[in-house]
């Protein structure tokens, strides 16, 4: 069981490093955020089932709801930015630039 948690922690850290490395493109950042949320969901689900804390069984579903909202808003922002500027660079999201 410890190797599963280790793999999930590595997946989370790789996705976090992907956010830090590929922060210039919005699509890459969104994919890395989805990887982080997926690893958190699986880790939370395994922890709840392993320790039999069924009073917290709704927490992974709430995390999935927030993840879906984040993905929807992120994709809407990606479409709006790519239509307005022709690319998906994060620097186009700065409102101070004209």
UniProtKB/Swiss-Prot annotation:
Compartments (UniProt record): Mitochondrion inner membrane
Domain of life (superkingdom): Eukaryota
GO biological process, one term: ATP synthesis coupled electron transport
GO CC annotations on file: mitochondrial inner membrane; respiratory chain complex I
Record's keyword annotation contains Acetylation: no
Main location (coarse class): mitochondrion
GO terms of molecular function: NADH dehydrogenase (ubiquinone) activity
Membrane topology: Multi-pass membrane protein
Keyword Heme recorded: no
EC code(s) of this entry: 7.1.1.2
UniProt protein name: NADH-ubiquinone oxidoreductase chain 4L
Species the sequence originates in: Caenolestes fuliginosus (Shrew opossum)
Phylogenetic lineage: Eukaryota, Metazoa, Chordata, Craniata, Vertebrata
Gene that produces this protein: MT-ND4L
């Amino acid at each position: 069981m410890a190797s599963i948690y280790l793999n999930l922690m590595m997946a989370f850290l790789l996705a976090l490093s992907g956010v830090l490395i590929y922060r210039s493109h919005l699509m890459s950042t969104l994919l890395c955020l989805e990887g982080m949320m997926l690893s958190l969901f699986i880790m939370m689900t395994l922890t709840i089932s392993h320790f039999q804390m069924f009073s917290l069984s709704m927490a992974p579903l709430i995390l999935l709801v927030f993840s879906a909202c984040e993905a929807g808003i992120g994709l809407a922002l990606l479409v709006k930015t790519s239509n307005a500027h022709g690319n998906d660079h994060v620097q186009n999201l700065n409102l101070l630039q004209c």
